């Protein structure tokens, strides 16, 4: 039930009222009427959050509960799950949300056990980030059980709420009755048009990996498009759009990297370029690759841009694949275009078969096992830190860097982009144009695809506003380009220093 006296007291003190009814055992229509009757005369009731594991009216009377909510103009609000992915399970809630066309509120809170472990500053930061990045419009601030910095429990709690409020106000957020996202479904014709664009991207990239004549490409494009459109019409459309969103997330960075390889090959037979020109081209090609990959991000946002995904009642499937597959496909494309394996390019069926046989039968030194183990550890961290939830803990130093970036930039860029991917890709271009060893260029290229793929994967988190995803990629590109330039300068300095010392040794001899 609901305490009418408490609700009235909250309203009398000038606050908005959020009610949290508990479901009845063997609930009846009379029980529901009783709950809402107790709300009569109480002003500013701006949301209902169910307590416990059941929605009010579950399992059979949730339609009646929803009707009473509409009648009293009270928004339905779901509780974000502890892992920050979708919602806490409450029987009947998902069905009610679907009938409301997913136009519901989303509340974020911190578990009391977790609150004990973090500072008030960290708690305020978590509420701030949750609100701006995950479509949170309701905050449930728990109270600290003990005071901090010689303050009372109440003052400590008020202080961290105040810090969160100040941060949000600086971002332009207003406080009061929370806005509820209206139902939004894009025009089906525009979705189909975007889907055909994603199919065209798929065919375009596949033919760069498996060469095919123009007429075969056209047949593949029109055939796949026809089947996809039929599936879209016959079904609700969610599954087929998810498939092509996943395809875009993989093919866009792969296509960007292959096009970049084709540009590199233009300089394959030429003499090493000057260091300055190679540096300028490294920056230029990074920007071009990022813009190409952004096509995939726009396709994802357009295909899955509806309230069901915004409010995370449906999520992008295959996030980890968007990190692994681009690396594998780019590795294949590289071996097709550059003579890395024993001075040969693997660009035919015969060469591919020969490569497999030679690879599986080659002699392996003992140290290779340590190298493979190290690469496996890197892959574990890389994949484990990706996706909607992270399975690898984040070190304290990185958390400090994240908080700094969150407070100084519009959207915190991803470390794998501006620390690893973008600088590595710039150095890969520089390495090729300066005729460095092929193995170094190959490894830098694989590291470079991480940043480009991560830029596209950012758009797979549909709960984050698309403009923020764009700015996250832009900020990462900006910092990554600066770090890439510094990396190239540092490498050039080390090479010059090495040559100078070698020349001195020769002179002394």
Describe the residue ranges of each PLM region.
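Soluble extramembrane regions of membrane proteins in the secretory/endomembrane system
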Residues: 1-188
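Charge-biased, low-complexity intrinsically disordered regions
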Residues: 6, 10, 35-39, 43-44, ...
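Substrate-binding cleft/loops of secretory-pathway carbohydrate-active enzymes
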Residues: 88-96, 188-201, 453-456
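Alpha-helical transmembrane segments of integral membrane proteins
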Residues: 196-509
């Amino acid at each position: 039930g609901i305490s009418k006296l408490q609700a009235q007291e909250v309203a009398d003190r000038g606050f908005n009222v959020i009610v949290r009814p508990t479901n009845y055992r063997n609930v009846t229509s009379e029980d529901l009427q009783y709950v809402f009757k107790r709300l009569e005369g109480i002003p500013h009731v701006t949301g209902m959050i169910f307590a416990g594991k059941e929605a009010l009216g579950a399992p059979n009377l949730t339609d009646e509960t929803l009707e009473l909510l509409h009648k009293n103009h009270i928004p339905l609000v779901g509780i974000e799950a502890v892992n920050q992915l979708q919602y806490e399970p409450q029987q009947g809630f998902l069905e009610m949300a679907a009938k409301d066309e997913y136009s519901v509120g989303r509340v974020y809170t911190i578990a009391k056990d977790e609150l004990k472990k973090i500072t008030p500053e960290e708690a305020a930061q978590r509420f701030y980030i949750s609100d701006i990045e995950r479509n949170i419009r309701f905050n449930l601030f728990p109270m600290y059980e003990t005071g901090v910095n010689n303050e009372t429990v109440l003052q400590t709690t008020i202080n961290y709420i105040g810090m969160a409020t100040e941060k949000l106000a600086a971002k332009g957020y207003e406080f009061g009755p929370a806005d509820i996202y209206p139902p939004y479904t894009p025009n089906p014709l525009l979705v189909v048009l975007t889907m055909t664009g994603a199919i065209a991207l798929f065919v375009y990239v596949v033919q760069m990996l498996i060469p095919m004549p123009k007429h075969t490409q056209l047949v593949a494009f029109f055939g796949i498009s026809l089947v996809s459109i039929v599936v879209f019409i016959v079904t609700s459309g969610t599954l087929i759009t998810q498939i092509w969103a996943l395809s875009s997330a993989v093919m866009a960075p792969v296509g960007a990297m292959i096009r970049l390889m084709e540009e590199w090959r233009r300089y394959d037979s030429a003499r090493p370029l000057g260091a300055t020109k190679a540096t300028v081209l490294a920056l230029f090609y990074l920007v071009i690759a990022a813009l190409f990959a952004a096509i995939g991000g726009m396709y994802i946002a357009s295909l899955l841009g509806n309230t069901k995904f915004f409010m995370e009642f449906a999520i992008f499937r295959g996030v980890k694949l968007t990190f692994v597959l681009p690396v594998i496909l780019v590795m294949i494309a590289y071996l097709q275009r550059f003579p890395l394996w024993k001075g040969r390019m693997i660009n035919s069926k015969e060469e591919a078969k020969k490569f497999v046989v030679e690879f599986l039968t080659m002699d392996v030194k003992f140290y290779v096992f340590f190298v493979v183990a190290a690469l496996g550890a890197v892959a574990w961290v890389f994949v484990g830190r990706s996706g909607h939830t992270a399975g690898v803990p984040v070190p304290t130093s990185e958390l400090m860097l994240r908080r700094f970036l969150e407070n100084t930039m519009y959207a915190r860029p991803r470390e794998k982009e501006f620390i690893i991917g973008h600088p590595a890709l710039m150095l890969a271009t520089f390495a090729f144009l300066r005729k460095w060893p092929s193995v170094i260029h190959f490894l830098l290229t694989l590291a470079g695809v991480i940043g480009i793929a991560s830029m596209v994967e950012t758009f797979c988190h549909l709960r984050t506003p698309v403009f923020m995803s764009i700015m996250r990629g832009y900020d990462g590109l900006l910092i990554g380009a600066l770090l890439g330039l510094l990396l190239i300068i540092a490498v050039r300095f080390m090479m010059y220093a090495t040559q100078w010392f070698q020349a001195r040794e020769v002179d002394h001899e």
